[in-house]
Structure formats: C-alpha cells, structure tokens
Design a protein with these regions (language model features):
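Short, low-complexity interaction segments enriched in Ser/Thr/Pro/Gly
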Residues: 1-3, 12, 20-21, 30, ...
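Oxyanion-binding/catalytic loops of NTP- or PPi-dependent enzymes
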Residues: 48, 60-146, 159, 173-175, ...
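Amphipathic alpha-helical coiled-coil/leucine-zipper-like oligomerization segments
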Residues: 181-193
Length: 415
C-alpha cells in the first residue's frame, strides 16, 4: 500500500515484546472511546488464533495458567499459557484445534462442541448457536431478524434490562427454566472452554483469561461478555480486539529495519467482516542501542451484519428449492430439515473453495425422500451479489481513513 498523505493524530503506539513490559503493550478493558459508528473506528487496541501469542503477555500479571479464548460467532479456539512454559493450543478429545461455540440441552444434561452439533440434527430447537450475537443487544437491534433469515428456530424476548433472552426448549429435564439470557448461554460456553483448558492442564485450576472481541463491540457488548465470564467465575484480564491482535501476531519473527511496513488485515468470519490497517517500523533505543519494534493501528472498519454464514445459506436455500421441485413436497419451516440443509450448505461451501462443481446426495431428508442435486462455485457467485457487493466496502473505508491507497493488483486464493 502507498501513502497518499501522512496519517496524523495517532499518538497511541504499541511496542512489540521482548523489549517492553506488557502494561505498555496491552491494557485492561477500557470502555472509553468505544465504537459508536456501525462502520469504522480509528485507534489502537488488540486477534484470533493469534490469541495464543497475546495470552503469553499476561503471565506477568497472573499467578497461574492463563486461558486465551478466541470467541467467534461460530467457533472458538482456546490456548493456555503456563508459568515458565510456552503457550499451547488446547485441543478437544478428538484433537481438533477449534470447537463449535454451541451447547445442546437434553435429559437434564448439557453437551457442547461438535457433539452438540451432531445431536442438533435430531433436536435442532435444543441446540444454541451464534449466541454471542445476542450479547449487549438492545430493543432496537435486528438480531432476531438475523436469526430468522438464517433459518434458526429460536424464539426471543426482551428482558427487564432491555436485553435479549432466548426461549428454553421444553422436555429437557430443566423444567424450572423458561428463558435464558444471552449472558447465561454464553457463560455456559465460556465455562466449557475453561473446562477444556483445565483438562488439558492436568486438572489445574484456571481463573484468569483473555478473550477476543470484534472491533465493533460497543461498551454494552463488552460489558455483556465480561458479565458472562463473571457468572462462571472467570476473571477477564483483558478483552482484545481481534484484528489488532492479528497485527501483533504478525510482528513475531519479523524485522522492519530502515523501512515502514503497512499491512491490511481482513477478517471475514461467520457473522461479520473486520478490517484493520497497521503500520510497522523499528527504532533504535537511545539508551540500550537495541532495536524496538513498534506498530500503529491506523484505521479500522467493519460490516457487522454480513459473513460467511450468509454464503452457506445461499446453498441451503438452493437445496430446499431443488427438493421441492423434485418431490412436490415443501418442508420449509421444518426445523430438522433446515438444520440439515444449513449444515450441508456450510460443508459444500468449504468444499467448493477447491472444486468447481460437486454432486450432492442427502438421504431421507423429508418424509422418506432423498435430495439428489449438484452444487457449483459459479452458482454461489451468481446468487450472492447482495452479499459479495458488501465485501469490499470495509476495506475501502479503512484505506480512506488511513489515507492509503492500494498499489498492485489482486490475486485469487482458495478460502
């Protein structure tokens, strides 16, 4: 990227370890100057599986192991740092490095992760997913419409605090529960993340954690995730902005001697798009004569109402239409069918990243009838214009705010 005009007004600067104390690099949750615009914010704060690096910086203020939770809309990744030991990625019992942020209720039990998704195919109203989207949302939020658009069978209501709660399914053995607040559901998932860390750490107690949050989170949303963590006894050392943490991770094992290096970090998740632009450089300390690496976050931008889940739904809607055309039966509104097609759309979307066209066969989808069709990358491209037309805008906004312009052309890459 080439500078059109020197950016000014960025007094905050991050210095990269090992040449700095962590208090200078990352601050505890700060509710001042949080995003109020739905689109962009200049400033500096901290990202995702990169959380493992950020967590390591907090050992200086913690007396025991610190848990890092990359708390995404669809999945979460967990890392642990022990005193005197390098950080490690926490894997589940199947050695998978990411875990669905999901919980299912039934028979007086709670089941999490991939097992929850598997059981959800049979009881889709009992499995709660994407619950982080509810955090801090008020009465004017369109979050309920978002779940409806993606064919989730949830019922919502406003609480006395004007936040959202989700209807609890009947017949699960938890007869005293009618609704669960957003904080309560997310607290359960955060507690599961902590329990995974405890199991990975041979039963050692874990209290302290660092949690990633989207750049666009407001004070209310940040407070909501802190409240969720406190419900299960987790002490949040810091909330870290996802794309800024990615910029921090980018500096590891890199030198920027005698040059300024500018990088755009573009993160398209399941529920939102986030972009940040950072400027990296190295200066020589006058006292120690040692190099110190610095970076400024020049700008941030986002679209918090679009993400990969909407592309998956393009395929799910196609499969539904194909089934109706083949059999003359219309299972729209059937929670089990819509759950299976949404999962199928997610799977095929990923496979079409490296394939042009694939056969699709889903047995016994509805009333003993099978779905037999095809899915192609071209179909997604032809039918997702309302989505894809919004993908570039945050990047352009970030460039504008940073007074930068792109030099060069694009290159295709597989997702």
């Amino acid at each position: 990227m080439k500078a059109k005009k020197k950016a000014t007004g960025f007094e905050d600067m991050a210095i990269i370890p090992p040449f700095l104390s962590i208090q200078e690099c990352i601050s505890a949750p700060d509710f001042e100057n949080l995003p109020s615009s739905p689109f962009s914010q200049k400033g500096i704060t901290m990202r995702r599986s990169t959380i493992v690096f950020c967590v390591a910086l907090f050992l200086a203020v913690a007396n025991a192991s610190v848990l890092g939770i990359d708390f995404g809309t669809q999945f979460m990744k967990i890392a642990i740092v022990r005193p005197g030991s390098p950080f490690e990625i926490v894997t589940d019992l199947s050695s998978k490095r990411k875990t669905p942020a999901a919980v299912i209720f039934g028979d007086s039990t709670r089941i999490y992760g991939f097992d929850a998704l598997t059981l959800g195919a049979r009881k889709p109203k009992n499995v709660f997913m994407r619950m982080s989207r509810l955090l801090g949302q008020g009465p004017n939020s369109d979050v309920a419409a978002e779940f409806k658009e993606l064919k989730f069978p949830y019922e919502f209501k406003l609480t006395d605090r004007n936040t959202w709660a989700v209807k609890f399914p009947a017949g699960t053995g938890f007869d005293d529960i009618d609704y669960l607040t957003a904080e309560e559901v997310n607290a359960m998932i955060l507690d599961y993340a902590r329990n995974m860390g405890v199991l990975f750490d041979n039963g050692q107690k874990i209290v302290d954690c660092v949690v990633t949050v989207p750049s666009y989170f407001t004070q209310h949303e940040r407070q909501a995730i802190l409240d969720a963590a406190s419900l299960v006894g987790l002490n949040v050392l810091s909330l870290i902005d996802e794309t800024t943490a990615a910029a921090l991770q980018y500096t590891v094992n890199k030198e920027f001697i005698n040059k300024t290096h500018r990088v755009m970090f573009y993160d398209m998740g399941a529920g939102s798009i986030q972009v940040s632009i950072a400027e990296f450089h190295t200066l020589i300390d006058k006292k120690t004569k040692l190099p110190k690496r610095y970076f400024d976050v020049l700008s941030k931008a986002w679209d918090e109402n679009i993400g990969g889940a909407y592309l998956s739904q393009v395929l799910a809607d196609k499969f539904m239409e194909d089934f109706v055309a083949q059999h003359g039966l219309d299972p729209r509104g059937n929670a089990k069918v819509e759950y299976r097609l949404r999962a199928l759309g997610e799977k095929l979307k990923e496979m079409l990243s490296v394939n042009d066209k694939l056969p699709v066969n889903e047995g016994t989808l509805f009333e003993e009838r099978d779905l037999a069709t095809t899915a192609s990358r071209q179909f997604i491209l032809d039918n997702s214009e309302p989505i894809t037309s919004r993908l570039v805008a945050p990047a352009l906004k970030a460039l504008e705010d940073a007074h930068l312009t792109i030099v060069g052309a694009t290159a295709p890459c597989h997702a």
